[in-house]
A protein has these predicted regions:
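Internal, hydrophobic beta-strand segments that form the core of beta-sheet-rich folds
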Residues: 76-83, 122-173
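Short, compositionally biased P/S/T/A/G/V-rich stretches that sit at domain boundaries
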Residues: 22-50, 171-207
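Bacterial N-terminal signal peptides that target proteins for export
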Residues: 1-12
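Hydrophobic h-region of N-terminal signal peptides that target proteins for export
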Residues: 12-22
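Surface-exposed extracytoplasmic segments
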Residues: 63, 67-68, 143, 163-166, ...
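Structured domain cores in non-transmembrane regions
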Residues: 68-133
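A structural detector for beta-sheet-dominated domains
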Residues: 41, 63, 118-120, 141
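Contiguous beta-strand segments within globular domains
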Residues: 47-65, 69-77
């Protein structure tokens, strides 16, 4: 009987330890911020300016943890990377153009928030940009902590982790020559548009 009791308690302790370990390592299935949709459009800027801008709208689903102060997620950084495959010029080859920009939100409340980026009309006209880019990806971080990519964070042309990593590597090497061309909303003529759906941004441009 004594041996049976020892065996029972030993198995019980092992089960508790395993359950505890599983609880500790299990990843959260509900990140604080997640990309729910990304849409692209061509549109004219307000106040009668000429030429179409290329707009990328990133819809974010925000779910602060219950213990978060004010039920907000602070300092959310959104980085958008675009990869366009452009037609070949006469006698040439098709080429890729990469653009990257980021914007940091002061804080996001529970619910939906939209973050927008724009390419100016000169590029839209020169490269005939319209529709979805061939490749795109969105990276998120909150208070300096990277948030794992969700299902809506990348284009359908990048279904696998290896393809996404390759895209980010190529973009890191190729986006430098286009630095500053993809612009967050607050640096464009659309700064005062979508007032109800636009969060406040951290501003770091030189004065």
């Amino acid at each position: 009987v004594h041996r049976r009791l020892l065996r029972f308690f030993s198995l019980l302790l092992c089960g508790v330890a395993a359950a505890t370990a599983a609880t500790v390592v299990a990843p959260s299935s509900n990140p604080e911020v997640e990309v729910s949709a990304v849409k692209f459009a061509n549109l004219r800027a307000p106040h009668g300016s000429s030429g179409n801008w290329y707009e990328a709208t990133i819809a974010l689903d925000v779910r602060p943890v219950p213990s978060t102060s004010g039920r907000m997620v602070a300092r959310v950084r959104v980085t958008l990377t675009l990869g366009f495959e452009l037609p070949a010029p006469p006698g040439g080859e098709r080429r890729m153009e990469f653009y990257r920009a980021e914007a940091e939100c002061v804080a996001l409340e529970t619910g939906r928030s939209d973050v927008r980026f724009y390419l100016p009309p000169e590029l839209v006209k020169r490269d005939q940009l319209h529709g979805d880019p061939k490749y795109w990806g969105v990276e998120l971080a909150a208070a300096g902590r990277a948030i794992p990519a969700g299902r809506g964070s990348y284009a359908s042309s990048l279904p696998a982790a290896e393809a996404r990593k390759s895209f980010q590597t190529r973009a890191a090497a190729g986006a430098g020559i286009n630095e500053g061309l993809l612009q967050p909303q607050f640096l464009t003529p659309f700064a005062l548009e979508y007032a109800r759906a636009t969060p406040s941004f951290v501003r770091r441009e030189s004065r």
